[in-house]
């Protein structure tokens, strides 16, 4: 319940709507509870004495009560819906804001599909609990108290039937809730797995078709879909036992009251109208108890969702800006002092070990290494996408942990290995680099990245729609747009993470020439092609997470065997791209 109480704090201004809705429910219930008393008067006084005036008077009063109950019920529905959907929107927004603050190490703990489920399905469960459960949560106790009270007022002996039924219903509810509670958690995890398969299959649909793996993906989907179906069936098979058991007890109570009340009517101890009114209260009380049981089941499921949402909100953010953070980076110098790094504290091996490296401001540095040599890991420590496990990373002469995160990352531009574009136009995507960039600035960045040559051929130019993930442009065009977007930031440190692999060597040469014109910008170029880095000021060779060698093209070619092997394989008829393959 602690998690659910905490999430109620996100109601904000919608608390007022819930309070008004509660008042409407109480009024609605009160109007409904008066109707059986009026009905008893019609039978026992109006019909028995053939008093038409009493019948009309009580009939009009019943109609007014019914209309007032209808009006208050409609008002309740309006206020509750506003509160439920407003609450859900606030929780989703809080989760999304929290995820935006996550470091990479935080994101590594969650699957993307799981986060989507947390923000959609789990929030919907909470909304449905308010929409479907708030009414009986308020109404049922009021109806129960008023119904039992009026029943004892009408006939204490018949009302004793409630004292027999209540323990039976309470025991059944306790058993069901205790069994169902853990099953709802498993149900939501099954939804996670289904969403993961769906997302993965749709994201990689081109690869699925290219490898003709449609049947395999269908079988995988059928597996998780069947798991979700079976988990749902097991959960709700037990949950729905609530209804037949409660109906059995309710109808048993009605039969007992009819039998006892009938005998009392025959013995003149009870009037027919009183028995009719009493039966109305019995049905209302029993229905209220059934509704309370449904509320408990709704709360049980919502608790499972609340715990999952709290996992996102309570995730400890491992990277944050310090107090009195430095807001300005003096220059683009980079230093690694005894840096070691592993992705998880419990990991046996380090991804990076004992890295010592000094890169003066304004230098262009190439980084080479085989697959798994931790090239990307190395550069991710510069903008604090991860923190070094041991040692210190310095930028501009200061420990990166002293900088304000936003200021640090604004001063470091990264062109990612995986090209990421968003739905929208070219202009909207480029302005991620500089939101207020003019068209002149956009075109200048595109020319530097050799993107202008294909954009100028497009009828809409910068207003060309890229489609979801940039599906309307080729891989090489995506790379050039990503480069242009990063150049717009005008960073002090520019990192290319194998970011020209999809462009031809001539285009790469033009981009390299444009980059050379950027003064006072430190450029780190991760590459597989030796031609991409041979003209840099220095080249760093990584091997198994360690710095193997540092030097210029000439010095490494003269004295480093790994560099010589790469050069020979790529420049003398070996592999055209990348580090030479090793035997599997």
Where are these predicted regions, by residue range?
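Membrane-integrated ABC transporters
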Residues: 1-32, 39, 47-62, 72, ...
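Helix-loop-helix
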Residues: 51, 55-57, 150-164, 234-307, ...
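ABC-type nucleotide-binding domain
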Residues: 328-584
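Hydrophobic/aromatic residues in alpha-helical transmembrane segments
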Residues: 35, 39, 76, 80, ...
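Hydrophobic alpha-helical transmembrane bundles that constitute the permease/transmembrane domains
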Residues: 26-34, 67-74, 126-129, 133-145, ...
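An intracellular "coupling" helix at the cytosolic face of ABC transporter transmembrane type-1 domains
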Residues: 13, 101-105, 121-130, 134, ...
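Short intracellular "coupling" helices and adjacent cytoplasmic loop segments at the cytosolic face
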Residues: 49-50, 85, 93-123, 196-220, ...
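Transmembrane helices of ABC transporter permease
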Residues: 13, 17-30, 41, 65, ...
């Amino acid at each position: 319940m602690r998690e659910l109480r905490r999430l109620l704090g996100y109601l904000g201004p919608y608390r007022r709507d819930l309070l008004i809705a509660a008042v409407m429910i109480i009024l609605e219930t009160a109007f409904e509870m008066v109707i059986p008393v009026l009905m008893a008067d019609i039978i026992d006084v109006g019909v028995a004495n053939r008093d038409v005036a009493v019948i009309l008077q009580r009939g009009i009063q019943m109609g007014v009560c019914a209309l007032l109950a209808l009006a208050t019920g409609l008002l309740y529905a309006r206020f509750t819906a506003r509160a439920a959907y407003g609450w859900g929107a606030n929780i989703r927004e809080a989760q999304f804001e929290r995820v935006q603050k996550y470091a990479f190490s935080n994101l590594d703990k969650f699957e993307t599909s799981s986060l989507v489920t947390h923000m959609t399905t789990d929030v919907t469960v909470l909304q449905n609990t308010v929409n479907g459960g708030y009414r009986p949560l308020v109404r049922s106790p009021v109806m129960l108290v008023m119904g039992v009270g009026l029943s004892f007022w009408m006939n204490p002996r018949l009302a004793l039937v409630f004292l027999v039924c209540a323990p039976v219903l309470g025991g059944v509810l306790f058993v069901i809730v205790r069994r169902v509670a853990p099953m709802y958690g498993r149900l939501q995890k099954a939804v996670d797995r289904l969403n993961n398969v769906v997302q993965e299959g749709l994201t990689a649909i081109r690869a699925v078709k290219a490898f003709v793996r449609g049947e395999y993906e269908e079988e995988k989907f059928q597996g998780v879909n069947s798991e979700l179906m079976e988990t749902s069936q097991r959960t709700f098979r037990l949950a729905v036992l609530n209804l037949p058991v409660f109906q059995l007890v309710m109808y048993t109570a009605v039969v007992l009251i009819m039998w006892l009340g009938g005998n009392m009517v025959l013995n003149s101890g009870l009037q027919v109208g009183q028995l009719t009114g009493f039966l109305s209260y019995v049905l209302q009380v029993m229905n209220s108890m059934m509704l309370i049981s449904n509320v408990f089941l709704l709360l049980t499921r919502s608790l499972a969702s609340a715990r999952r949402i709290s996992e996102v909100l309570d995730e400890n953010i491992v990277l944050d800006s310090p107090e009195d953070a430095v807001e300005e980076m003096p220059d683009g110098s980079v230093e690694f002092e005894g840096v070691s790094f592993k992705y998880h504290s419990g990991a046996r091996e380090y991804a990076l070990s004992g890295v010592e490296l000094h890169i003066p401001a304004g230098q262009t540095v190439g980084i080479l290494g085989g697959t798994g040599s931790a090239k990307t890991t190395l550069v991710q420590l510069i903008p604090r996408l991860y923190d070094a496990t041991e040692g210190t990373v310095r930028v501009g002469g200061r420990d990166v942990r002293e900088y304000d995160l936003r200021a640090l990352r604004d001063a470091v531009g990264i062109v990612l290995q995986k090209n990421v574009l968003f739905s929208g136009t070219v202009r909207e995507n480029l302005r991620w680099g500089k939101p207020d960039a003019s068209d002149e600035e956009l075109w200048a960045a595109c020319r530097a990245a050799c993107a202008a040559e294909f954009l100028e051929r497009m009828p809409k130019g910068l207003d060309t729609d890229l489609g979801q993930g940039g599906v309307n442009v080729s891989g090489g065009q995506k790379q050039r747009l990503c480069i242009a977007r990063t150049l717009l930031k005008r960073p002090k440190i520019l990192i290319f993470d194998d970011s020209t692999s999809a462009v031809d060597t001539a285009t790469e040469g033009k981009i390299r020439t444009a980059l050379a014109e950027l003064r006072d910008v430190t450029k780190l170029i991760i590459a597989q092609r030796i031609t991409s880095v041979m003209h840099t000021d220095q080249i760093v060779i990584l091997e198994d997470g360690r710095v193997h060698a540092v030097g210029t093209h000439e010095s490494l070619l003269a004295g480093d065997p790994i560099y010589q092997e790469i050069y020979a394989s790529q420049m003398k008829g070996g592999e055209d791209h990348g580090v030479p393959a090793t035997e599997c």
